[in-house]
Regions:
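Flexible "arm" and connector segments at domain edges
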Residues: 1-113
């Protein structure tokens, strides 16, 4: 099968992945299947955290889940930028005081909700 290639921009890469995934796994939302696969990939990351390909499997599945819920590559990239800006604007506890085995979550108050 002839799959599309992608250029250097992230939107084109998401679109190429989307086309391949549609041809390979079909057009349905596949939510339960994607979540099941994500859980398995997270186990693989935990077993081998220094393998970047395992981390990328998680990224690809998350992107697959997003476009299968109806979001375009442009919307996905815009959401990524918006979330990054939102996280940068939040207050965070000092990482040195955090348990390294627990998530570091932003400080929650009415202004950050």
């Amino acid at each position: 099968m002839n799959y599309p290639t992608y250029e250097s921009d992230f939107e084109s890469m998401i679109e190429a992945q989307r086309q391949w995934s549609l041809q390979t796994f079909g057009p349905t939302t596949r939510l339960a299947g994607i979540l099941d696969h994500l859980r398995k990939e997270l186990d693989e990351v935990e077993a081998n955290p220094s393998d970047v390909s395992e981390w990328i499997d998680v990224v690809i599945l998350a992107l697959d889940g997003a476009w299968r819920q109806g979001f375009s590559p442009v919307e996905i990239v815009e959401a990524l930028r918006a979330k990054y800006a939102k996280n940068r604007a939040r207050m965070w506890p000092d990482w040195r005081d955090a348990d390294p085995d627990k998530a570091i979550e932003h400080v929650r108050n009415e202004a950050t909700r």
